[in-house]
């Protein structure tokens, strides 16, 4: 106060004011500070005094021909004096206005393409809905979040190569575009940005926004997907929140969400198979999410979630060093421990063999709805500070911490036998047994834990065994805090190993993850997940089995049709047709199979009755063990949508619809893919299928020996000719192609030539 008073007195004297306002700044240090280096030291001030001048802008001399000296109001737009020290003209800010209104216009077609992320953000905000503002204490915790909606997931290096290739294609320097996403993006962007007049550097910056995930460690209460983070400043303050529903979704959030669902489903399915690790890898490699291979997404996507991390570990990728227990992510922040096997008795006198952690340790625990700080020593909880959204979430965190502490009173609180099993009907390990037991009912645990009087500490209150808050007493060592505990910020990744039962360990042998930790929560994926592995088809019920079976046939049609003609039994026994059998009513399964197999045999025998769409449609029915009967069917029943639906043997139905015009197949209203050939080529097509790689030269020529069967064709060498027996005893002369490039057109030409050769 004294100093301020003194200053006021000084300022009231006119001499002081004069010294301060009129004296030149001639102190060398000050002059140095403001004049050394190219960096502007006070940009705001510089801008203010520059704009106060009449001609603060310099421009190329050509501007004098492009802009009049005065505008409509008679104000001068540029000065005849040259800019000191350069060959440029001094220009007024009014010239900018004139240029914007009357200057030449260029095509704006590229702007929405280059500034795509901004245009999309405006759309999202336009269609978003902002709800009421609520005033309440915000429990924010810092989380690593994605701040850049609408990006691909390329690494910085991959993006750099794409940007160089798109924006500066003629620059020297090695660029290797290897991944599928790199190639697709490069091709797409080159087409979009043809003849683009926007400054290349700007285009490069904007491309970077589109290609690379940018994460920040920010305090968040609520949604963490990028479409919420972009409006974080509008939706949550220190003591208020505003409800907001985004006006659109972005692909990167959808990928993150769909990846988690796919990974959870795959881990759950792998757990019950004979070799979980091998099955998991097979499924990861054969699954596509939104049209991208799941393994490619796993390599690039930094999402940390238990199931996703198990899949990454299986692929040999590094993952975060934190471990998971009871749905919480634990990160040790100090201390250390050694592990020792110990046997203990539960309250029910059941013996448990537990790996005890000996030593003092501190952990942060972060879950979706609660966070905590835990201090513990050998089999004793010293302190647990927990914060959460509601009573339920806080209770969940307390149970997990109490079990993790391995305290004797927790083990003695067990009532009844522990015999929880996993999906594969194997007993859970003791720690998860205890966890499941208390998650079902923690009353005895809380009652036996003990309570203690508490001191009045700012921002902390106690919690009683019935989970009600209190300012006097609390569960021993447990306090509830208003402040959240930040997520572990480091993005460090460590090398891990995984065993065949999908338990993930760090290099010291500590278990970081196991299938027990995978959440049961089931959402609906935002992007289409295609599990090509037939192990996964049943996951989404009968409809999914139906769609996936037909998609598999279409994808593998080339091989399927050859097997259909040459080795049908092998085809009928394919594992991919197994899930489909559960849809066919048990009573008619073998009758359908016998009927379809007979029908197929007739098609093979009678030339020209081959109908691709019909074979695809009926093939799955032929997989059941057949019953030889004379029964004919005009439609076959499948059990989907809770009732029997009919597939017509000839013609379309809601279940199976082939559109001749678009050549696309729709199963239960879902697109199942396109047929690459026209089924109506009356495709004497089995022959044409089998004769891929052969040229049909005409009618039989006896010089080339007796007619071979289709199966014997494989013996021919390139360029060799032979007579072949096709269909019902017709013989044509063929030659094995010398090169493979034109194989694609063979099936169409073969069909036409067979007809010509026979007629």
Swiss-Prot record:
Q: Which organism is it from?
A: Influenza A virus (strain A/Equine/Kentucky/2/1986 H3N8)
Q: Which UniProt keywords are listed?
A: Cap snatching, Eukaryotic host gene expression shutoff by virus, Eukaryotic host transcription shutoff by virus, Host gene expression shutoff by virus, Host nucleus, Host-virus interaction, Inhibition of host RNA polymerase II by virus, mRNA capping, mRNA processing, Viral transcription, Virion
Q: Where is the signal peptide?
A: none
Q: Name one GO cellular component term.
A: virion component
Q: Name one GO molecular function term.
A: RNA-directed RNA polymerase activity
The protein's role, per its UniProt record: Plays an essential role in transcription initiation and cap-stealing mechanism, in which cellular capped pre-mRNAs are used to generate primers for viral transcription. Recognizes and binds the 7-methylguanosine-containing cap of the target pre-RNA which is subsequently cleaved after 10-13 nucleotides by the viral protein PA. Plays a role in the initiation of the viral genome replication and modulates the activity of the ribonucleoprotein (RNP) complex.
User: What's this protein's family per the entry?
Assistant: Belongs to the influenza viruses PB2 family.
Q: Where in the cell is it found?
A: Virion; Host nucleus
Source organism, top-level taxon = Viruses
Q: Name one GO biological process term.
A: symbiont-mediated suppression of host gene expression
Site feature Avian adaptation, where? 627
- What InterPro entries does its record include? Flu_PB2_2nd, Flu_PB2_6th, Flu_PB2_C, Flu_PB2_CAP-bd, Flu_PB2_middle, Flu_PB2_N, INV_PB2, PB2_helical
Record protein name field: Polymerase basic protein 2
Q: What is its main location?
A: virion
Where is the motif Nuclear localization signal annotated in this sequence? 736-739
